[in-house]
Design a protein with these regions (language model features):
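Accessory carbohydrate-binding/adhesion or oligomerization-edge regions at the termini
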Residues: 1-83, 165-207
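Short beta-strands within extracellular/lumenal beta-sheet-rich domains
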Residues: 96-108
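Aromatic-lined ligand-binding clefts that engage carbohydrates, nucleic acids, or primary amines
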Residues: 110, 114-128, 162
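Surface-exposed loops/turns
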Residues: 112-113, 156-158, 278
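Surface-exposed loop/turn motifs at beta-strand-loop junctions within extracellular Ig-like
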Residues: 124, 166-168, 287-291
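Beta-strand-rich ligand-recognition modules
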Residues: 130-177
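Ser/Thr/Asn(+Pro)-rich, low-complexity disordered segments
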Residues: 202-420, 454-458, 552-831
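Extracellular polysaccharide-recognition and catalytic grooves
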Residues: 370-381, 388-594, 598-600
Length: 831
């Protein structure tokens, strides 16, 4: 008999060793109802309490009087072991209301027989069975907000079988997990049942914990190489799948392959097909040996271009080149069809597939279908004569049958509440109403003329908010392209008043893009960020906008809005090029405010070689979301990016909001003085993760020197210097190897400096960084920085920045960037 895998949990730790049944997912919409219009147009970064949707109401009715029987014979398809997460986590994104359920099991062996307490946390529902008997049920079903209770389990001295049914109702992004904390005294052993060998499972889990891409980015002709820390002790099969982008996840994977990690080897190799597009790709991995199987999801960047594109000609010529690129390489979505029709090309099979998928998204009201109905309306308005009559009729039916706002009948989980979705829904309603003014819209019972009039009023409120407060999703590489969907469509189809207002906001967006783009990479502090935009700036959907607008950058397959920019006649303001590429020896400095309640006070320092930006003050000590507060991008390599945050989740590859790298679990106090940013973190008494960390991928910088409390990096002739209030621990194994640098403690501080080496060596800079004094003081909490690289700076946790002892409040309340030109900072001569 194989040795059963046994994992020990100590008091206060969570149990994560479980055998997993299949994830069951069933469409579950609930009754059609009219929602209440509760949008107040005060957009914030974070989850909005939107009330209860029909699917959740239906779940509550279902569970009220049901009886859940033990299912003791479910098929075990995978294993979850300690290492990724303190939760048993199945979170994800479902575009339609979906009932989720999964059976899991383990065997508990306590210190001795008796009744033992556990803390049980979840968002959905959990039913707990011990030795065949139902012991507990906990069903809060609170959307994405964990609830907890204490349960008592009777455990036999020689072990008890524990089975749980874990359930949730998915409404787009869904926190679906169980966190089971051992409160008893002494060690609790969890034995994973099944025929899987214990030692084999432990080996597979060690591989799954450690596996990561061998490179920050893979280029032309390179294989995908995945590395681990310890060699395999037996030949392990590794299956890998590259998924479509998040909005196309319902389609088959882009790539599937298997490789073998041979005995004694630490690298698995996958040949990447030429048709796999460039992108930051999610990669599902399955490790298997005999009957043992472990699953893991990671990601990797693929960028075959060895440098940014340099587009010749004026804006019109660059737009034409952009349309040609997208017509050939664009993702199979409505935007690609628009690009091809704008060029006068006939529909091909890919276009028809894209339109079929677009219509399905609209008809079934998938979340984010508002992002594709707008380009579909553009296609219909400008190119309907190029469409076959049958397809034209289907498009007309989809437009007339759509749900354009939450107060119309529906039982979907479309997200109506964030800044970008509000805009897209209102724009879609305006254009659809104008195109079909005399028709009755089947879902609402209103005429197109009534819809258009209502949309005008709603859009006026949206513009009032954005004009008064700026953007909650400032500078976001993920969400500016979505804003462009709505704004560019308004610029093309709206009446004069809304067109003018749209152009004003477009001008602001392109001004901010110009400020925050360096060598073709869109970077900078962001109101909402995900790992994919942070780790792979040139692969974001925002990057090509800068390429077309300013002539240098990266083109990729993103078609959410770029075809609308290229097919339309909007022209960004003149004079922005000077901010895109400052002259040698000069630096551009900018300060401005964005977001409701001055949520973001933004500072920028940028030279031709390096860019530093930060969001000042924010809400220190509060729970974070997706705010990306401190950012550095060097011009020497498109992936030469550095930032600091407090991780918001356990798993370095997880997708929580905030995640391990995107956003902050606990918000810091941040300030910036010219080329120096200070980051002061107070995590409170019982932080889930008691450290802050820097993302700094050493391999994409030309050189680096690390000291006990500093790290300096060179990119071409520019530098990035990090200094910390405690030892900087370079992570050498697992997903953080070569990129992650931690400072432990509930309170910590960092200084980030950028500039030109000015002919000095990196060693000279390292000596100056070592001689810089960065210190924390309590009562009141503050961070002081003094040394040869900066004036005397102090960041008070309550009162903000002091320069040479004088209080330096943020200098403006304007949404329009206040810009100054400075002499670029260069490393001074060492004494």
């Amino acid at each position: 008999m194989p040795e059963r895998a046994r994992f020990v949990t100590h008091t206060g730790e969570t149990v994560t060793a479980f055998a997993l049944g299949r994830l069951e997912a069933v469409y579950y919409p609930g009754a059609v109802t009219r929602g209440a219009d509760n949008v107040d147009y005060k957009f914030i970064n974070g989850f909005v309490d939107v009330g209860e949707l029909p699917c959740r109401t239906a779940v509550r009715a279902e569970i009220a009087d049901r009886t859940v029987a033990l299912k003791d014979d479910f098929e075990i398809v995978s294993t979850n072991l300690p290492g990724f997460n303190r939760r048993l986590e199945f979170s994800g994104f479902w575009h339609r209301p979906t009932r989720l359920s999964r059976w899991v099991r383990t065997r508990f062996v306590p210190p001795e027989g008796g009744d033992y307490s556990f803390r049980l946390a979840t968002c959905g529902g959990v039913h707990v069975f011990v030795d065949g008997n139902k012991i507990a049920a906990f069903e809060p079903y609170t959307r994405n907000e964990a609830q907890e209770t204490e349960i008592v389990l009777p455990l036999a001295a020689d072990g008890s079988d524990l089975v749980m049914l874990v359930e949730e109702i998915a409404e787009r992004d869904t926190n679906y997990f169980v966190e089971l904390t051992w409160l008893g005294e002494g060690p609790l052993a969890a034995e994973v049942p099944g025929n899987a060998d214990g030692k084999t499972l432990e080996m597979l889990m060690a591989l799954a914990r450690a596996i990561r891409p061998a490179r920050i980015v893979f280029g032309e002709g390179e294989d995908l190489r995945l590395v681990v820390d310890q060699p395999a002790t037996a030949a392990v099969t590794i299956e890998a799948k590259v998924h479509q982008s998040v909005h196309m996840r319902h389609l088959p994977p882009l790539f599937e392959a298997a490789s073998t990690l041979a005995v004694g080897e630490k690298e698995a190799v996958f040949a990447l097909p030429g048709e796999l597009p460039d992108g930051y790709h999610e990669l599902d991995i399955a490790f298997s040996l005999g009957e043992s199987r472990i699953n893991r999801t990671i990601a990797f960047a693929l960028l075959r271009d060895d440098g940014p594109h340099r587009l010749a000609g004026d804006l019109a010529a660059r737009k034409r080149e952009g349309l040609s690129w997208l017509a050939e390489h664009g993702e199979l979505r409505a935007g690609r069809v628009l690009a091809r029709l704008a060029l006068g090309l006939d529909l091909d099979d890919g276009d028809r597939a894209a339109l079929e998928d677009t219509l399905d998204a609209i008809d079934t009201r998938r979340d984010c279908s508002d992002f594709v109905i707008v380009p579909l309306l553009w296609i219909y308005a400008d190119h309907r004569e190029a469409l076959p009559p049958s397809l034209r009729k289907r498009i007309e039916a989809a437009i007339l049958g759509y749900r354009y706002w939450m107060d119309e009948p529906g039982n979907d989980t479309m997200w109506f509440w964030s800044e970008n979705h509000v805009l897209c829904f209102h724009v879609a309603e305006l254009i659809a109403g104008g195109l079909f003014a005399e028709d009755v819209f089947a879902n609402s019972g209103m005429s197109g003329r009534e819809h258009a009039a209502l949309a005008e009023k709603r859009l006026a409120r949206w513009f009032d908010a954005v004009e008064d407060h700026g953007l909650a999703e400032w500078n976001s590489a993920a969400y500016y392209p979505i804003d462009f969907i709505g704004l560019l469509a308004l610029q093309r189809f709206a009446g004069e008043t809304l067109k003018t207002r749209a152009e004003t906001v477009l001008d602001r967006l392109f001004s901010m893009i110009a400020l925050h783009t360096i060598n073709g990479v869109s970077a900078g502090s962001m109101g909402r960020a995900y790992d994919k935009e942070l780790r792979a700036g040139p692969l974001s959907e925002l990057a090509p906008f800068a390429t077309i607008a300013f002539g240098t950058g990266w083109l990729n397959r993103g078609v959410a809005a770029l075809p609308m920019f290229c097919a339309g006649d909007y022209v960004p303001p003149e004079g922005l090029d000077q901010f895109v590429a400052p002259p040698e020896g000069r630096a551009v400095s900018a300060h401005y405010v964005q977001g409701y309640g001055r949520a973001a006070q933004l500072a920028l320092y940028k030279t031709a070689g390096v860019q530093l930006s930060a969001s000042i003050d924010a809400t220190p000590g509060a729970k974070g979301h997706q705010q990306h507060l401190v950012d550095v991008q060097a011009a020497g390599h498109p992936m030469a990016r550095v930032w600091i945050n407090h991780p918001g989740a356990d798993d370095p590859w997880g997708s929580d909001r905030p995640s391990y790298w995107a956003g902050n679990g606990v918000m810091p106090r941040v300030t910036q003085h010219q080329n120096c940013c200070l980051f002061l973190s107070d995590l409170g008494e019982n932080p889930r993760l008691a450290f802050t960390h820097a993302y700094a991928p050493l391999s994409v910088f030309d050189d680096h020197i690390a000291g006990e409390d500093f790290l300096v990096l060179r990119s071409a002739e520019s530098f990035v210097a990090l200094k910390a209030t405690g030892p900087i621990e370079a992570v050498g194994e697992g997903p953080g190897a070569g990129i992650e640098h931690r400072v432990r403690g509930k309170r910590s501080g960092w200084a980030i400096l950028v500039g030109a080496l000015g002919g000095r060596s990196l060693a000279e800079l390292a000596a100056l960084a070592e001689g810089t004094n960065l210190s924390l003081s309590d009562d009141p909490l503050n961070l002081s920085c003094e040394g040869p690289l900066t004036p005397a700076l102090r960041l008070d946790y309550r009162d903000g920045l002091f320069v040479e002892g004088r209080h330096a409040p943020f200098p403006t309340t304007s949404q329009t960037p206040e810009i100054a030109w400075l002499t670029a900072f260069a490393v001074p001569a060492s004494n």
